[in-house]
Amino acid sequence: MSTKNEQLFAQACKHIPGGVNSPVRAFAGVGGTPIFMHRANGSKIYDTEDNAYIDYVGSWGPMILGHAHPKVIDAVKKAADDGLSFGTPTPFETTVADKICEIVPSVEMIRMTSSGTEATMSAIRLARGYTQRDKIVKFEGCYHGHSDSLLVKAGSGMLDIGEPTSKGVPADFAKHTITIPYNDSQAIKDCFEKWGEEIACVILEPIAGNMNMVIPSQEFHDTLREQCTANNSVLIFDEVMTGFRVGLGGAQAHFGIDPDLTCFGKIIGAGLPVGAFGGKKEVMSCIAPLGGVYQAGTLSGNPLAMRAGIAMFEDLTAEGFYDELAVKVDRLVDGFQAAADKHGINLRTNKLGGMFGMFFVTDGDTAVPQNFDEVTECDMEVFNTFFHGMLDRGIYLAPSAYEAGFMSIKHSDEDIDTSIKAADEIFAEMAKA
């Protein structure tokens, strides 16, 4: 780690809590000093000394076209020339809304927000208003942003600091949140048998990306849909991470499930601050000004993010885009797995579309983790060694064993081969240790 980077971190710590503006950036889970970046292009990000790193974080998912995509940058520049924010409706919001509703059949109406957290928070308020019920169901290890009712046994950065439930969340608030095991169909049935008439909604990541990457069973999703329908509870898919990432139609298209509401994140604005929630017209009509559930935001649907999103969707909807992306992920993940197998390293992997997960399990008999408890049983020290080894070789992975990885369309065969070679070297060193 360079002295300059340590100086930057020390300077940041003076006025920024922990030196970062989002906890996972602090390297708390992996140790060491976070690297300060100052620019990015294509598949690479560059630190303040202009060292290049092949990036598999992609701003936590949205940089599916690669960093600084010319079409997106041009759209943002033109938008900025026309004014940054108006506080009025714009035609660009309608264009993005129309495009999302066209792509995702379950979304009949949609409301823009400024973040994924706002989207999930608003979707839950809407579900409560629509059903006139208070209780919500979430799953262990699923992260839905930092609103109070959702920071109960959450994944992502909460796990890195060893606090699965945030301090500062009143007990009276948390009592309305029921948390059950992920990928457990019987737990869903038991939950509805006990509280069915009180449950406003169930919210989940349809593929969990904040306890690494856990792909649940089809039975799990079928059971969720059946139970929510039978009990008149709203099914909310948090596709902030998976939407337009695991496929054009998101995880709901992969599983063939139509949720009642869906939440999206900054990918719809090509990485700029934006989110959205949408779904059935009957439910969405309860939002003000049509209904009595209030939600608002000065920068919701801001023109910079909307025009960036319009440019991005032109590429995402091109024929073969997601096939090409999946080929890149297959090449990378299969290469990692082959290298680990060669050196006797207990690696398990998951992948779908442009998203992947890596788990260092504790023995050769352990399968790919299927839930929160199994993920937490993985060997975090081995991951930390792997993370820093890759970082030293110019490969940037998420600085946490609880986060998924992301591929962009700009990652080249050379990038992928370089990454596999680096992993092979690290696994060889591990095998000798």
UniProtKB/Swiss-Prot annotation:
GO biological process: protoporphyrinogen IX biosynthetic process
Matching InterPro entries: 4pyrrol_synth_GluAld_NH2Trfase, Aminotrans_3, Aminotrans_3_PPA_site, PyrdxlP-dep_Trfase, PyrdxlP-dep_Trfase_major, PyrdxlP-dep_Trfase_small
Compartments in which it is found: Cytoplasm
Record field: catalytic activity: (S)-4-amino-5-oxopentanoate = 5-aminolevulinate
A GO cellular component annotation in the UniProt record: cytoplasm
Protein name: Glutamate-1-semialdehyde 2,1-aminomutase
Similarity annotation: Belongs to the class-III pyridoxal-phosphate-dependent aminotransferase family. HemL subfamily.
EC code(s) of this entry: 5.4.3.8
Protein source organism: Psychrobacter arcticus (strain DSM 17307 / VKM B-2377 / 273-4)
Essential cofactor(s): pyridoxal 5'-phosphate
Quaternary data: Homodimer.
Keyword Amino-acid biosynthesis attached: no
